[in-house]
């Protein structure tokens, strides 16, 4: 029976849209513009330990569309998920929380952003796939630079180690 309790567990508890904002500061005049918008996309990833074995993972994306230096729209959305991860070694837990969880919730975020932009009266912006391993590696490098030796080994959005 004790062996069963030590089996690795990883499952999604919930996926939810944590924040969504849309701004159209130059409407309705912007709809009369004939030029194609220039799209800028910014991405951020976060993680927080909620309780023993429970983690919240977030992906935030800001999409800004400009036509002739005027903002057509700005959408910022944060998709989150609560994940249960128990009996997983730190060397496997870190990549799971830093890479696997964001990869799981990102498709929901892409759909929500495309829907918000379409409902605002613009053609949808189809966000490309993201390699979340790059974000994870950047955070590991930041953590190594800070020489943080105490913590759970989970790298937080600011590059610090999560504390137990």
Swiss-Prot record:
Main location: cytoplasm
Signal peptide: none
Gene Ontology terms, MF aspect: unfolded protein binding
Keyword Protein transport: yes
One annotated GO biological process: protein folding
Localization per Swiss-Prot or TrEMBL: Cytoplasm
Highest taxon of the lineage: Bacteria
Keywords from the UniProt entry: Chaperone, Cytoplasm, Protein transport, Translocation, Transport
Assembly, per entry: Homotetramer, a dimer of dimers. One homotetramer interacts with 1 SecA dimer.
Assigned protein family: Belongs to the SecB family.
Protein name per its UniProtKB record: Protein-export protein SecB
Species name: Herminiimonas arsenicoxydans
Lineage: Bacteria, Pseudomonadati, Pseudomonadota, Betaproteobacteria, Burkholderiales
């Amino acid at each position: 029976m004790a062996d069963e309790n030590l089996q690795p567990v990883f499952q999604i508890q919930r996926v939810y849209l944590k924040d969504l904002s849309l701004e159209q500061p130059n409407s309705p005049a912007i709809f009369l513009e004939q030029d194609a918008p220039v799209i800028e996309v910014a991405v951020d990833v976060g993680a927080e330990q909620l309780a023993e074995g429970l983690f919240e993972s977030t992906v935030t994306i800001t999409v800004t569309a400009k036509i002739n230096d005027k903002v057509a729209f700005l959408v910022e959305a944060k998709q989150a998920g609560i994940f249960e991860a128990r009996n997983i070694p730190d060397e496997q837990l870190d990549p799971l929380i830093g890479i696997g969880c964001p990869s799981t919730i990102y498709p929901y975020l892409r759909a929500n952003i495309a829907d918000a932009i379409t409902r605002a009266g613009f053609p949808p912006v189809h966000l490309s796939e993201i390699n979340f391993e790059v974000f994870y590696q950047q955070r590991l490098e930041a953590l190594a630079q800070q020489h943080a030796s105490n913590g759970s080994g989970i790298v937080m959005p600011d590059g610090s180690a999560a504390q137990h």
